[in-house]
């Protein structure tokens, strides 16, 4: 046993210090970035925000809606190969360049992903997603995926520390997904006692990944556009959003009615709801590590997307960053005890 004495920080623990700026307008800020990935060699440009690969967020409808903003969608892994084929045949090339295929690490997952990629060679991103990216089996699967799909950009996660980030990149991942327990419907930290405050995880993993020519995704912990800006300021190349994009027309959640008001169900992918829906229930040897919530219907996602991008542009103007790429270089975090004036929050 050992104790690390260094304080680790989440997004709620800091604010970004404003700095002198020459920008006249938020419209002067360029949010698009261009990346050339380490192993695949592919180049991608767009807004580096990703809708999470949850079945109540990462849907085909969400992908079509967010692609108009240049935003990526990690489509959840529960679509069949036939559904994928129907989607790609009806979607434009501009939509498909912003789509990721998600997979688990079972033999069945591998075979289905192989089929999807064979039928739809225009898809360039594969997101290998497990709750615990520290297992030897996971690292071996990433290496297997790299060998099988050498020209695809591979995302692997989730982890929260630099040494594991490096191992995944050296095993074939182009991008590492960072975050254990910060999600809005994730209960891993309270069920297991395991986790890492998200901002510190991003800072540590970004340093490790960039040293090897890889990239990272900050996955989880964002509750408002300011948190997205903090994640980018901390060194994240991409930011993945779940709860902030849930409850919309494109989210695909079940709609329920209570007292004449309609709500959409949103749940973590390790929740009892998800496991009951996809694998017939919670296995006897495990506990559910997610919860189910009812969200008021929020209308089309385009309004939320504009709000997020507007907040991000504004953050850049406050520190003089004319491009999103410059935000991390211009970010100084200050530790705080308060984030906002909450006097009217209950109204």
Swiss-Prot record:
Residues engaged in binding K(+): 181, 183
InterPro entries assigned: Aldolase_TIM, GMP_reductase, GMPR, IMP_DH/GMP_Rdtase_CS, IMP_DH_GMPRt
Keyword annotations: Metal-binding, NADP, Oxidoreductase, Potassium
EC number of this enzyme: 1.7.1.7
UniProt xrefs under PROSITE patterns: IMP_DH_GMP_RED
Gene3D superfamilies per record: Aldolase class I (3.20.20.70)
List of residues binding NADP(+): 108-131, 216-239
One GO-annotated biological process of the protein: purine nucleotide metabolic process
Catalytic reactions of this protein: IMP + NH4(+) + NADP(+) = GMP + NADPH + 2 H(+)
CDD domains: IMPDH
GO molecular function terms listed in the Swiss-Prot or TrEMBL record: GMP reductase activity; metal ion binding
Residues at the catalytic site: 186
Gene Ontology CC terms: cytosol; GMP reductase complex
Disulfide bonds: none
Subunit structure: Homotetramer.
Family matches, as NCBIfam families: GMP_reduct_1, PRK05096.1
Family recorded in the similarity comment: Belongs to the IMPDH/GMPR family. GuaC type 1 subfamily.
Function according to Swiss-Prot or TrEMBL: Catalyzes the irreversible NADPH-dependent deamination of GMP to IMP. It functions in the conversion of nucleobase, nucleoside and nucleotide derivatives of G to A nucleotides, and in maintaining the intracellular balance of A and G nucleotides.
Name assigned to this protein: GMP reductase
This protein's encoding gene: guaC
